[in-house]
């Protein structure tokens, strides 16, 4: 055999193929094309039957192995006559001689896709049904062929079949092409193994009840888009999707506008999550991952947007808007008059997209509701952090469980505003103070390194609207100064977690100011 087969540009002819697929998409066209090109086809079980039923010559794998399919199909291809043909490096004379002595023919092409394990799990199937969909022979063939890519080409998805037929007609795949196919194949089996291992760890062999988080975490992400740049123009960036995750912003459909940027995605994700923190119709406007305004309404989504925008119109310029409701024509008319980077919603009423599209560059997204459970990952140098998602589901997130530390019990309207303020705090970077009136933020103090400055910023932004408003703090007041900043400005009721060594001093300051002060016992830091 000539040495030029080891060169990247040299092609290796395809004379013998092994095909074993669960997904039969494109199978007949592939098999017919291979046959017409003079390729001998060896196949397994239902794949062989599907090919033969169309009158295409095919050799059942048991004719090659001399051993029948057994154990309900669990053993079909796990045989030396198959794997020697996959693993023989035909660049090596000793491998070629060994095959000849054993009467084994090498394979030039392997086409395999695997049992639908993840789909079976997602369907709610029983444990036994899921176990039966753990493919053994398929990954073994794929890995063997991929390892032996100098001699074998391997294809694992139907979207690669056109490339196979093109290669067959033009003398085969080059070594460089076989390397790419091998890389794709190992990614395919890696994704499969991660799915199986994750399911095994969570279902068949879960941690002890005291261990709420797994001892091992695996995941795979596929690049979905190369972005113009990252947070800054000198940084490269791309969007990756987790095929096993709850559909989220990464899977959003873009209806109009320029391509999404890295910062668009981070802000849209923050806005999307903030909007769904509330059961009522809600609109959140985000800039640099912090709220410019959040509002709820019992009237309309347009009303919620109006109130959210009024919180901080200056900062909302060039912001990202999200709502948990369908965007109405009325809201679209208003948004179309404001420079907005992105708007994301679960749906749009007829005519709304056309109105928004008057702005050439606005990015219009449709996305599914974000998950309310699960875990979050954050990379750090040398590892990552994993935590339970803050889903506002702590006992202290329900006003029924709040403790009135001082003052008169709030009336229903005031309590509703306190609840909204408390839930809105989750979306604000710590230290966070939120001032609320009539179901809308009117002042947001975010990202300060001390709580009193967060209170001052919230009061400053609220202006005259602070009088008679309510406020929430994402963590306890360590000193009374932050609370006093709010009460002196005119805030009439405050909710905070409590738990400080100086809670009694803070409560005394609230009593002196004559306000209602509630303790939640829960905290909502966001870093």
UniProtKB/Swiss-Prot annotation:
What family does the entry list?
Belongs to the PurH family.
Query: Which GO cellular component does the record give, naming just one?
Result: cytosol
State the encoding gene: purH
Identify this protein by name: Bifunctional purine biosynthesis protein PurH
Q: Which InterPro entries match?
A: AICAR_Tfase_dup_dom_sf, Cytidine_deaminase-like, MGS-like_dom, MGS-like_dom_sf, PurH-like
User: What does the record list as GO biological process?
Assistant: 'de novo' IMP biosynthetic process
Q: In which pathway does it act?
A: Purine metabolism; IMP biosynthesis via de novo pathway; 5-formamido-1-(5-phospho-D-ribosyl)imidazole-4-carboxamide from 5-amino-1-(5-phospho-D-ribosyl)imidazole-4-carboxamide (10-formyl THF route): step 1/1; Purine metabolism; IMP biosynthesis via de novo pathway; IMP from 5-formamido-1-(5-phospho-D-ribosyl)imidazole-4-carboxamide: step 1/1
Tell me its EC number(s), please.
Answer: 2.1.2.3, 3.5.4.10
Catalysed reaction, written as an equation? (6R)-10-formyltetrahydrofolate + 5-amino-1-(5-phospho-beta-D-ribosyl)imidazole-4-carboxamide = 5-formamido-1-(5-phospho-D-ribosyl)imidazole-4-carboxamide + (6S)-5,6,7,8-tetrahydrofolate; IMP + H2O = 5-formamido-1-(5-phospho-D-ribosyl)imidazole-4-carboxamide
Question: Does the keyword field hold Transferase?
Answer: yes
Which terms does the record give in the GO molecular function aspect? IMP cyclohydrolase activity; phosphoribosylaminoimidazolecarboxamide formyltransferase activity
Comment, domains: The IMP cyclohydrolase activity resides in the N-terminal region.
Keywords from the UniProt entry: Hydrolase, Multifunctional enzyme, Purine biosynthesis, Transferase
Family annotation (SMART domains): AICARFT_IMPCHas, MGS
Matching Pfam families, A to Z?
Answer: AICARFT_IMPCHas, MGS
Which Gene3D superfamilies does the record match to this protein? Answer: 3.40.140.20, Methylglyoxal synthase-like domain
């Amino acid at each position: 055999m000539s040495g030029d087969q080891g060169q990247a540009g040299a092609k290796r002819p395809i004379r013998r193929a092994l095909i074993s697929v669960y997904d039969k998409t494109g199978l007949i066209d592939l098999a017919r094309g291979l046959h017409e090109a003079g390729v001998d086809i060896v196949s397994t079980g239902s794949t062989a039957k599907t090919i033969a039923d169309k009158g295409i010559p095919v050799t059942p794998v048991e004719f090659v192995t001399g051993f029948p399919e057994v154990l309900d199909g669990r053993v079909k291809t796990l045989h030396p006559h198959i794997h020697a043909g996959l693993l023989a490096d035909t660049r090596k004379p000793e491998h070629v001689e060994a095959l000849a002595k054993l009467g084994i023919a090498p394979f030039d092409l392997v086409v395999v896709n695997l049992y639908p394990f993840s789909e079976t799990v997602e369907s709610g199937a029983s444990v036994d049904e899921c176990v039966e969909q753990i493919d053994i022979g398929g990954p073994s063939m794929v890995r063997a062929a991929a390892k032996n890519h100098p001699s074998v080409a391997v294809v694992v998805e139907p979207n690669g079949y056109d490339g196979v037929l093109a290669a067959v007609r033009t003398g085969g795949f080059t070594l460089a092409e076989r390397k790419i196919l091998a890389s794709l194949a190992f990614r395919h089996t890696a994704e499969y193994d991660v799915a199986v291992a994750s399911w095994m760890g969570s279902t068949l062999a879960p941690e002890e009840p005291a261990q709420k988080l797994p001892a091992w975490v695996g995941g795979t992400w596929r690049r979905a888009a190369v972005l113009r740049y990252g947070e800054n123009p000198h940084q490269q960036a791309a969007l990756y999707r987790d095929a096993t995750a709850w559909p989220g912003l990464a899977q959003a459909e873009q209806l109009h506008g320029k391509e999404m940027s890295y910062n668009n995605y981070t802000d849209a994700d923050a806005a999307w999550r903030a909007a769904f923190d509330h059961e009522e119709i809600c609109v959140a406007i985000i800039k640099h991952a912090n709220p410019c305004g959040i509002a709820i309404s019992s009237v309309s989504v347009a009303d919620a947007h109006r109130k959210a925008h009024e919180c901080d119109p200056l900062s909302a310029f060039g912001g990202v808007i999200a709502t948990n409701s369908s965007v109405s024509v009325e809201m679209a008319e208003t948004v179309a008059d404001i420079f907005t980077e992105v708007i994301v919603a679960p749906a749009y009423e007829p005519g709304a997209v056309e109105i928004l599209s008057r702005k050439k560059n606005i990015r219009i997204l449709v996305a599914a509701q974000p998950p309310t459970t699960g875990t979050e990952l954050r990379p750090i140098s040398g590892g990552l952090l994993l935590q339970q998602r803050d889903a506002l589901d702590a006992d202290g997130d329900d006003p029924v469980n709040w403790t009135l530390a001082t003052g008169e019990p709030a009336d229903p309207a005031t309590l509703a505003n306190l609840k909204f303020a408390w839930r809105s705090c989750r979306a604000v970077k710590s230290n966070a103070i939120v001032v609320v009136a009539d179901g809308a933020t009117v002042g947001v103090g975010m990202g300060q390194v001390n709580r009193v400055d967060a209170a001052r910023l919230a009061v400053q932004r609220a202006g005259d609207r602070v009088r008679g408003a309510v406020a929430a703090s994402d963590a306890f007041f360590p000193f009374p100064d932050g609370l006093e900043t709010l009460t002196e400005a005119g805030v009439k009721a405050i909710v905070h977690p409590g738990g400080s060594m100086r809670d009694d001093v803070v409560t005394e300051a609230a009593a002196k100011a004559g306000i209602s002060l509630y303790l939640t016992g829960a905290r909502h830091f966001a870093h």
